Amino acid sequence: MRVFIIHNKYRYYGGEDSVVDEETKLLKSNNHEVIQLIRNNSEELKSFNSKLNTFKNISYSNESIEILNEKVSKFGLPDIVHIHNTFPLWTYSVLDFFKKKNIPIIMTLHNYRLIWEKLGFLNKNRKNYGFFKDSNILSYLISKLTNKRKDLLSYVTKFITHTEFTRQEFSTVILSSNKLIIKPNFLHSTSNTIKPIEDKKNVIFASRISKEKGILTLIKTFKNIDLSLDILGDGPLLSKIKKKDFKNIKFHGNLSRNQVSNFINKSKFLVFPSEWYESFPMTILEAFREGTLVLASNIGSIKSIIKDKYNGILFNSGDCFDLKKKIEWILANPKECNKIVTNAFHEFNKKYSSETNYRQLIKIYEDAIKNYKN
């Protein structure tokens, strides 16, 4: 099977970029012809003119159409196209292009940009973080412009969501709910064995260092805790936070996936304190795989992944007091924590391995191709 993978990389390498790379490797390892068509914000948006041009064409990009025509001339048409992130360079114009070529389209809904107004800006009961430049006003404007041609979403054959929570949220916008399929993210299994939590020392945070990821709540909490915290990653708040003097916090910057996995493996527990809806955090999966306890905020799809005190620990999002309380519980109950880790480890091997995910992904592709032709 020939598969085109379409993705717009982010400025900071994150979970979506990782999923694209892992799915590509997975398909290639099963002898499929995979061609990645990647555009990159950091490379293509350097000048003022390029940024202005992108803003003008954010609803529909003729430049993207030209690029796709060149790629099809070079490689030929695919059997199926799998689209990940289209913002801001590709745009929904890619849907128009492949529909006219009669190619079935799979689209993974990694984030909530499509329904951002519903989830945050127009909902006073929810804490909201702008996805663009941390600005609500700019995010509202970009959301309006980006979704100006959301009529093109009707060309998508199947949408992949990661949990029942995300499927329900997107069903309010994508009225053809039969197009929404649940397929979680995955990681390749390792030969690691589970180490008792008592034998581990530090705590780890591995994510984008920005407000919506809960980094400020985490740091405020750790001021009053006698534990060492390793912070992995980059982001807009890194330089500001590093200026402060934290005796028990170390910053390690961006690391390779293997380095991140090694850190997680050696850590007592991973804290995932996000304060904005996540889709399916890869670092939580890594902790499951590495036999490391997860302490996460009880928000959005995280509650679909983690069952409190069964395969992880949940705390109230943005609540320093509750976070500290749950950390104290972990330290006081190592036996219970080891049982939780074992449950998560077994769940990973059953539900989130590459073998299981490949069977799910290829069935989605095959069904889409078969039904499209019929």
Which residue stretches match the model-derived regions?
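Short acidic/histidine- and often glycine-rich active-site loop of Leloir-type glycosyltransferases
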Residues: 284, 299-309, 313-314
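Carbohydrate-associated surface elements
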Residues: 165, 186
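Membrane-proximal helix-turn-helix segments that form the acceptor-binding/catalytic region
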Residues: 100, 125-159, 173
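Conserved acidic donor-binding segment of nucleotide-sugar-dependent glycosyltransferases
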Residues: 308-309, 313-320, 329-334
